Amino acid sequence: MLDKTLRMNYLFDFYHSLLTEKQRNYMSYYYLDDLSLGEIADEYDVSRQAVYDNIRRTEAMLEEYEQKLRLLEKFETRRSLLAELRKAIASDQAVEACNSLIDRIEKLD
């Protein structure tokens, strides 16, 4: 399992277009630029609690999008299968293993 920051960064990459501009800005400042709640609050002239609440709600939204669309899950599965494919190519049973992995990758979508 990915640590929370890395997971949120991935979810943000996949689903940022579904967020409002304010949500994108808060998440970007907090997770990508590593700004504190206080720094973000100063930038937007709001309370730290308002920033915290917005970020937590946005995190929940991103998790909900992932439950429905599973883009991160498919990405991780695809990456894992491609790593197996690279390993299989280097082995003796390359043809059978590669065909099997290709079939699994094709079934992801």
Curated annotation (Swiss-Prot):
Belongs to the UPF0122 family. This is UPF0122 protein ABC2295. Pfam families: UPF0122. Might take part in the signal recognition particle (SRP) pathway. This is inferred from the conservation of its genetic proximity to ftsY/ffh. May be a regulatory protein. SUPFAM superfamilies: Sigma3 and sigma4 domains of RNA polymerase sigma factors (SSF88659). Signal peptide: none annotated.
